[in-house]
């Protein structure tokens, strides 16, 4: 149902100025090396059969580069930035998501398309797109593709024909009916709210802070209700992973603890302890205790 309302939103021209957001097509897999081939490209291609859609290669895309959006026109309805790279600077896209888009074309005057007329923005990625902070979260609607399709099982294997290319009139009519129903359901219900999967959350931590940190955190979080100095925890991390301080700084480690616990919904408390020379200490908290307090 979530996918249906997202399709309806993308196909309809209305954009709510009070709730601007982009659509992110991700994958329900923890390891980005196993990603790809799940159907994100087919999803984008399907939308392009009903809406004026511009596809941009996101691997080497830079939002501040001259002529970055030169293929966008006044009648462009969807801008799909595909295969975005690891740790893409999502903040760099804030203005085109919330305010409008400036289009530069060679040997032509600059054109600004205001928010209400600008294309809706969609990303596809095998990784995750950072969303720490309320600003980023409000500007993202993530849809995860399961690994049902992949290199060993393609849509052609399942359906017995190539999607779109091999369709007859009846198949196209079924497709159009489905897409129009998506728009109708979106108009009735809006875009539904869903929680992202635990796999996506772990992938986000892995991409931002490393596999070694994720493994360390998942082990440490089992030590409940014990105060530990951040310095001790950091040294244990260095010892376990073999990192040097210059490779993984205390500042990065502290940020990783704070942001990863937020992403993974790991409950913890922090304080400055007089018993430990006023150094920062943390302890991981039993979830049911937090729920009782709330």
Named regions from a protein language model:
Residues 58-67, 87-90, 106-111, 118-119, ...:
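Positively charged interface segments
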């Amino acid at each position: 149902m979530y996918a249906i309302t997202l399709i309806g939103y993308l196909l309809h021209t209305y954009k709510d100025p009070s709730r601007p957001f982009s659509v992110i097509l991700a994958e329900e897999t923890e390891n980005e090396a196993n990603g790809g081939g799940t159907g994100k490209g087919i999803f984008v291609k399907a939308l392009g059969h009903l809406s004026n859609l511009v596809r941009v290669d996101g691997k080497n895309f830079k939002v501040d580069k001259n002529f970055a959006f030169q293929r966008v026109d006044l009648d462009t309805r969807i801008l799909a930035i595909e295969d975005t790279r690891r740790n893409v600077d999502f903040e760099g896209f804030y203005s085109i998501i919330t305010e409008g888009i400036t289009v530069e074309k060679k040997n032509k005057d600059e054109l600004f398309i205001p928010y209400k007329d600008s294309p809706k923005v969609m990303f596809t990625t095998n990784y995750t797109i950072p969303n720490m902070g309320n600003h980023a979260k409000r500007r993202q609607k993530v849809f995860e593709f399961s690994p049902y399709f992949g290199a060993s099982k393609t849509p052609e294997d399942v359906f017995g024909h190539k999607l779109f290319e091999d369709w007859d009139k009846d198949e196209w009519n079924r497709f159009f009916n489905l897409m129009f129903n998506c728009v109708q359901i979106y108009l009735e219900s809006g875009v539904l709210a869903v929680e992202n999967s635990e796999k996506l959350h772990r992938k986000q931590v892995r991409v931002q802070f490393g596999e070694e940190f994720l493994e360390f955190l998942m082990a440490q979080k089992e030590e409940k209700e014990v105060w530990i100095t951040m310095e001790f925890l950091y040294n244990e991390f260095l010892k376990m992973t073999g990192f040097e301080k210059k490779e993984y700084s205390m500042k990065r480690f502290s940020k990783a603890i704070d942001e990863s616990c937020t992403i993974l919904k790991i409950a913890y408390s922090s304080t400055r302890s007089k018993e430990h020379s006023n150094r920062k200490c943390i302890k991981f908290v039993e979830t049911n205790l937090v729920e009782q307090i709330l």
